[in-house]
Amino acid sequence: AWLKDRRIFGDLPLSAVVLWLVVAAPSILQALMPGLLDMFRRDPTLIRDGQWWRILTSVFVQDGGLAGTVANLLTLAVVAPPAFRLWGAARGWALFLLGQLLFGLLTTAVFPSTGAGNSGATLALAAAAAGIGVLVRPRMPEIVLTAVIVVGGATLVTVDDAHGFAVLSGALLGAALVTLFPPHSMDARRAGESLRPSAL
């Protein structure tokens, strides 16, 4: 990881657990307090009226009932640990929140819809690994995986599913982050290549 992240239960990043709890707590509490959904969900009309915070707060509640809540929280539980091991705590949080911000803006301005859930931010966090995969380890498996992710995101866009933009924006965020702040292994490899006789 680029930034040190405290681990618990072996190789499980504490920051990933905290992220899951921050999202899961209000989502589960929503079963006892249904009014939380109306209070935090994304509503383009209310957002245009000045309640801009709904773009971000909508990630902490779920609009898919029990099945949707379980699916979203399970997906986050699978995605967050490896993502935070890869990116570190600060960058992992940044990617999740930026993914939610972009998804919220798109579903407010481009694909106006009322809703809630962490699916967009989770997909962006997962897709960010595609951006780093090709740049750090440009081998066939990474290239194929990135191509599948990008094509999948583009396909969702063509059927007017805003989650496609979450996938594509996540991949772009990952590529931008690894380009601006490359991991040490990438720096070392580039330095080694520059010192080869063929490069001199």
Task: Locate predicted features.
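C-terminal transmembrane module of polytopic alpha-helical membrane proteins
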Residues: 1-9, 153-200
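Aromatic-enriched alpha-helical transmembrane segments of multi-pass intramembrane proteins
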Residues: 6-21, 50-54, 137-160, 191-198
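N-terminal TM1-TM2 helical hairpin plus the immediately adjacent luminal interfacial "cap"
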Residues: 11, 16-94, 109-115
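Aromatic-anchored segments of alpha-helical transmembrane domains
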Residues: 23-30, 99-108, 146-159
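Alpha-helical transmembrane segments in multi-pass membrane proteins
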Residues: 76, 95-99, 103, 166, ...
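Membrane-helix interface "capping/anchor" motifs
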Residues: 84-92, 129-143
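Alpha-helical transmembrane segments and their membrane-interface exit regions
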Residues: 103, 124-132, 169-180
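Membrane-interface micro-motifs in multi-pass membrane enzymes
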Residues: 111-132, 162
